[in-house]
Swiss-Prot record:
Name this protein carries in UniProt: Glycerol-3-phosphate acyltransferase 1
Summary of subunit composition and partner proteins: Probably interacts with PlsX.
Highest taxon of source: Bacteria
Disulfide bridge positions per record: none
Pathway: Lipid metabolism; phospholipid metabolism
Stated role: Catalyzes the transfer of an acyl group from acyl-phosphate (acyl-PO(4)) to glycerol-3-phosphate (G3P) to form lysophosphatidic acid (LPA). This enzyme utilizes acyl-phosphate as fatty acyl donor, but not acyl-CoA or acyl-ACP.
Keywords: Cell membrane, Lipid biosynthesis, Lipid metabolism, Membrane, Phospholipid biosynthesis, Phospholipid metabolism, Transferase, Transmembrane, Transmembrane helix
Catalysis performed (reactions): an acyl phosphate + sn-glycerol 3-phosphate = a 1-acyl-sn-glycero-3-phosphate + phosphate
UniProt GO cellular component terms: plasma membrane
Principal EC category: transferase
Gene it is expressed from: plsY1
Species of the source: Deinococcus radiodurans (strain ATCC 13939 / DSM 20539 / JCM 16871 / CCUG 27074 / LMG 4051 / NBRC 15346 / NCIMB 9279 / VKM B-1422 / R1)
Family named by the database record: Belongs to the PlsY family.
Amino acid sequence: MTLTALLALLLSYLIGAIPAAAWLARARGVDIRKVGSGNSGATNVLRSLGKGPALLVASFDILKGVLAVLLARALGLSAEWAALCGVLAVIGHNFSPFLAFRGGKGVATSFGVIAILDPVLGLTTFVLAIACMWLTRFVSAGSIMGAFIAGALVLVLPRPTWDRAAVLFLAALLVWQHRENIRKLQAGTERRLGEKVS
């Protein structure tokens, strides 16, 4: 591992670790970790603060994934390192040192990584995940479905090994991060899209 690659990995992790949801909520006098699901992500911001702040958070979180991959490319690193930098950004988002190694579930940041690695795969996953979300009215269901779609497509499409490994890892991590949502979906207690924090 070269010093450049090590620096890129570290910076990617730190970029991903920027807790946009928590900091934006704090600026509005809300501790996002103590309201709603306690998750530091766009969905909890939507329920706690509304559409505008949620859109800002989602956009920033997507950008984190994109920037990590672009950083690796700008430093002249190979495609393998670019994919790994994307993965590190998602890990940083999910386990941020700024939030005692807690964070979000990595949906938006994973989408940013996948979209920049493979725009067609990213767009296809996004459209189908959004469709699932609107049909079921569950953000978590759309996110989980998106993970399965991305994982399935990357296995059947001719993709480089490193891109395939990165997407499969991110898909598995996303499903794992939603394990509590899966239990709530099974129990019928998961909040639907549009429900506010009580």
